[in-house]
Regions:
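Bacterial Sec-dependent N-terminal signal peptides
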Residues: 3, 15-37, 142-153
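N-terminal export/targeting and maturation segments
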Residues: 20-67
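N-terminal glycine/threonine-rich, aromatic-flanked beta-hairpin/loop signature
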Residues: 47-102
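Sec-dependent signal peptide recognition
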Residues: 2-9
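Beta-sheet ligand-binding and adhesion/scaffold domains
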Residues: 89-153
Length: 153
């Protein structure tokens, strides 16, 4: 009986040792952005079919809207001031925009590797319209009033 137990233990041990650890795909690590100055971002208003190029300078930026993805017909242009706070271990990078008409947006920069556009990893900024205290503004139906999504490679 002891011999049978030893034999079973030997077979079980041999089987465990022969199991291979599955290969893990290497994780993609992308650098955090320390700044968004002098960068070009893209956005699309799918409801109104407007394609945007958003250019960030040192402290101001410009958002240009086009009627198609080929950027042939410019239909809008507006300027904004912005602040950018780089990410820390505890907090995502923060982005705040204030347009010339006083409309404000606030949100976060999501690191590359979490979203893809055309099968490419992209940095992603998610902004919501906010009041002067930084609180998200909701419409009469309790839905977020306005948001902007933008990305860059």
């Amino acid at each position: 009986m002891k011999l049978l137990k030893y034999l079973i233990c030997f077979v079980a041990s041999t089987m465990l040792l022969s199991c291979e650890k599955p290969e893990e795909s290497p994780s993609k690590t992308y650098p955090a952005l320390e700044s968004i100055s002098n960068t070009l971002w893209y956005s699309v208003d799918t409801k109104n079919q407007i394609y945007y190029d958003i250019t960030y300078g040192e402290t101001t930026g410009e958002m240009v809207g086009y009627s198609n993805s080929l950027r042939e017909d410019e239909i809008s242009r507006c300027n904004f001031a912005y602040t950018f706070t780089p990410a820390t271990d505890e907090v995502d990078a923060l982005v705040n925009l204030t347009f010339e008409d006083g409309v404000r947006y606030g949100g976060i920069l999501i690191p590359k590797g979490n979203f893809q556009v055309n099968n490419e990893d992209v940095y992603w900024i998610q902004l919501y319209e906010v009041d002067d205290k930084g609180n998200i503004i909701y419409d009469d139906n309790g839905k977020i009033k306005s948001s902007i999504l933008m990305w860059r490679e």
